């Protein structure tokens, strides 16, 4: 994948970059693996805003991804590498000998014509999915399950990978992209390799309108709002916050306030918390 830079024909174009989509081999998705999706603009069933700064954006079909990879000991052929508007990584269309097709997250190095499989007997090579118990220590992995059979939940974004550090009892010790080291059951599955499209982080949005295409609306500072809209609002001109600590829009302390409960059940599985950003 390469990065395209544009001539500064307009202010929005000046700093914009995009992918050249060199890895994409097919532009039309598999119709049998598409589902329609409706956008709620961040509202719940009562019409209340539960997630701010959402709304608009281009219509998209959802590509049904096989995160579980439970079709064991059957070799599948990679038919195409495709773009997915719903995620940062690319996806790969695979086909089994019985004609069934599925989408998987496309790892780095996966190409059309390669063979992938899943199960305890699968080889340790890019794109194969195995239980953590069958993966050697030191292997880079992605699409990791947290509960056996639930499907991969961790490490699915473009360019990310986790490393299997070792095994202890019924748990595997995995270091995640964030720097967090945690224990995961050995019966949980993961896919070998690093997620592809690693240069995605180098793309510069360039203009506000491109964010609107993604369904993201503007974010406004609390200090320029009215006092009935935000605790920082009101005052004459550029007024200070006027409180001992910065506040969230709902009046809770923020900027440094810890939000994770120390009593969370998963806390006992975390050996080392993620690195401070």
Curated annotation (Swiss-Prot):
Functional description taken from the UniProt entry: One of the primary rRNA binding proteins. Required for association of the 30S and 50S subunits to form the 70S ribosome, for tRNA binding and peptide bond formation. It has been suggested to have peptidyltransferase activity; this is somewhat controversial. Makes several contacts with the 16S rRNA in the 70S ribosome.
Recite the UniProt keywords alphabetically.
Ribonucleoprotein, Ribosomal protein, RNA-binding, rRNA-binding
Record's subunit section: Part of the 50S ribosomal subunit. Forms a bridge to the 30S subunit in the 70S ribosome.
Q: Name one GO molecular function term.
A: rRNA binding
Query: NCBIfam families per the record?
Result: rplB_bact
Superkingdom to which the source organism belongs: Bacteria
Q: Name one Pfam family in it.
A: Ribosomal_L2
Region of interest called Disordered, as start-end residue ranges on this chain: 220-277
Q: Write out the similarity annotation.
A: Belongs to the universal ribosomal protein uL2 family.
What GO terms fall under cellular component here? large ribosomal subunit
What is the designated name of this protein?
Large ribosomal subunit protein uL2
Compositional bias (Basic residues) spans?
A: 254-263
Q: Which residues cross the membrane?
A: none
Q: Does the keyword Transcription regulation apply?
A: no
GO BP terms, alphabetized: cytoplasmic translation
